Amino acid sequence: MSKGYESKMREYLRDYMKVAREVKAIILEIDPNARVYVFGSVVKGRYTVSSDIDILVITDKIEEKDRMRVRVYKLVEAPVELHLATPETFNNWYRRFLRDEEIVEVT
């Protein structure tokens, strides 16, 4: 990895909420009622330069998931991992392993 690349990755990871807001803006164009959260190593403060930013989108428009993914991955330069879930999937799956302090809503 080049020093420039490492520096850019550290900046993205350190400013993860800025990246998450960028993702949220894109998602809200498709689903204005979606909720967007960040979780994982960046929230815990345990990231490395090879980490990504885990972003969870809770949407009732799950049929738009491919469109959401394409738009985000096309427009966002930062290393993000997009997770899309219905409210039911969030409550039945993600809530099983995410503690409240490990997930942050993007405002």
Would you name each region that the model predicts?
Residues D54-I55:
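Structural signature of the urease/amidohydrolase superfamily beta/alpha-barrel
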Residues M1-A34, V43-S50, T59-T107:
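Catalytic core of pol beta-like nucleotidyltransferases
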Residues F39-S41:
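Glycine-rich beta-strand-to-loop/alpha-helix junction loops that act as flexible
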